[in-house]
Amino acid sequence: MGFWNDATQQAILDTTIAIGGAGGAGYMIGLELARIGVQRFDIADPEVFEDVNSNRVFGVRDQTIGLNKAEVFRDDILAINPEAEVRVYTDGITRDNVAEFMSRADLVLDATELNMPDLGTMVCREARRRGIPVLNVEYVGHGAQVTVFDPTRRFTFERMMGLDENAPLDAIATQTISSSRFLSYIPKYGDLRTLMAIREGAPLPSNMIGAGTAAQLGVAEAVKLIRRRVGEKHASPTFAPRVRWLDPYAGVAGRTRLPRVSYYRHLAVAVVRNKSKSHETAGYTKDARARRGDVD
């Protein structure tokens, strides 16, 4: 209560958060919101925890390997607040359940995979229809970025990702989203061979620094959005096309309303540092991952 008033605290208690995807950032955001007082959650994730998730997801423990992520997430929230209401969707978000998933939500956290653009599009379209803001966080390197899609504004998820706002979901499912669309920040210390590996289909690498930073940015934006519901507008959320990023490892932070320009500006710096060999080398090429047994 030393940081907000009674109205804000009550709004936090009354808020329902819908979380699509119980990965690193989504999981931490949910747990931290539970600790500040959010009591109602709807969580969707069809996947089970694997060993590889242990580098960034609080829910991964020896005894949770092989268990559904959403169900473990629910149990961890209830361990913080036994009176919390948590609904889980172990089939993930589907066309059949997306309306029910958002039926009581005040805020949606879209932590779905961008390699399935139809899923993120479906979530954001349903949220727009219901007038619900969508929080989007991404982590890259040891940093992260955040933006919010406001249902009352013209800059939509599809527009930001370079997708047709009127295209059917089946058509969007065949699209590939360029990294210049969903990343506004590239760390100058990054090894560009990692970026090339991602473009060739390797999973986006992650660690606890980046995931933790994404969680802090996400929680901060969530609190701003909750406070706006009771008329507290001192801190404005980062509404798209604006994107805010933070990299505690590099000691840099920034905000832009031109995300693609920001991407290419950061990329240019990274290219120069890679050519001059002043970057930090990584082991994420296909050959390096094959030697570790990460790929077939």
What are these regions (language model features)?
Residues 1-2, 224-296:
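Phosphate-binding loop/pocket of nucleotide- and phosphate-handling active sites
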Residues 1-17, 24, 204:
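A short, basic/flexible loop-to-alpha-helix module at the beginning of a structural domain
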Residues 13-50:
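Glycine-rich adenosine-cofactor-binding loop
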Residues 43-81:
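Glycine-rich phosphate-binding loop and adjoining beta1-alpha1-beta2 segment
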Residues 70-107, 111-120:
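A structured beta-alpha segment of the ubiquitous adenosine-cofactor-binding alpha/beta core
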Residues 107-150:
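ADP-ribose/adenylate-binding Rossmann-like module
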Residues 151, 213-232:
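Oxidoreductase and adenylate-handling cofactor-binding alpha/beta cores
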Residues 156-213:
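A conserved mid-domain beta-alpha-beta active-site/ligand-binding segment of alpha/beta enzyme cores
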